[in-house]
């Protein structure tokens, strides 16, 4: 976000840093908020898919809209809404029997870091490609992130749910 604010709107390093700090502070608390409003195993997967589509739309708007105040508001919304990702941990916990939960959470965490690395690599390539064509890189990067989130949401909807989510009483009390 910092480089985009500097390149698009001539923000100073301090101004863009303040925005990054604000986003970081919001990101500290938004997962706790989503943890408190977790709808439970029956509706959690739909929430995750829908929030990822909403965040995808916000990223697309950041890429397409060239208005500093609106982009700042969109980025703050992304920071607030990205707390929904904590629901994925609850979903993993609810999807595996207690003796496999630790391993499942470890695999999920490693897969998430792999995904972050792949997206960073891909968006770096997209930015270079866009610049080579004389296009604004931030538009291409934000559109790519939006497309990846939308594709991920669609794939998640098609993945079969765990049988434990269909019969939550099998595992005992849902602590997620």
Question: Model regions: which residues?
Answer:
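Intracellular juxtamembrane helix-capping segments at the cytosolic ends
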Residues: 83-97
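Short amphipathic helix-loop junctions that connect adjacent transmembrane helices
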Residues: 1-15, 128
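A late C-terminal transmembrane helix in Major Facilitator Superfamily
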Residues: 98-131
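Helix-to-loop junctions at the C-terminal end of transmembrane segments
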Residues: 30-43, 127
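Hydrophobic core of transmembrane alpha-helices in multi-pass small-molecule transporters
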Residues: 69-86
């Amino acid at each position: 976000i910092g480089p985009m604010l500097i390149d698009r709107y001539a923000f100073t390093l301090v101004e863009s840093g303040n925005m990054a700090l604000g986003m970081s502070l919001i990101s500290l608390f938004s997962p706790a908020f989503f943890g408190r409003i977790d709808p439970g195993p029956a509706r959690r997967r739909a929430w995750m898919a829908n929030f990822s589509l909403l965040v995808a739309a916000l990223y697309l708007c950041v890429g397409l809209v060239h208005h500093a105040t609106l982009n700042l508001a969109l980025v703050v919304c992304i920071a607030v809404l990205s707390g929904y990702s904590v629901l994925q941990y609850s979903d993993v916990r609810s999807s595996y029997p207690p003796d496999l939960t630790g391993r499942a959470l470890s695999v999920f965490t490693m897969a998430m870091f792999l995904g972050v690395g792949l997206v960073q690599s891909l968006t770096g390539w997209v930015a270079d490609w866009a610049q080579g064509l004389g296009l604004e890189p931030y538009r291409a990067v934000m559109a790519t992130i939006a497309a990846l989130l939308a594709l991920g949401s669609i794939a998640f909807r098609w993945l079969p749910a765990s049988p434990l989510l269909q019969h939550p009483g099998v595992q005992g009390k849902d602590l997620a």
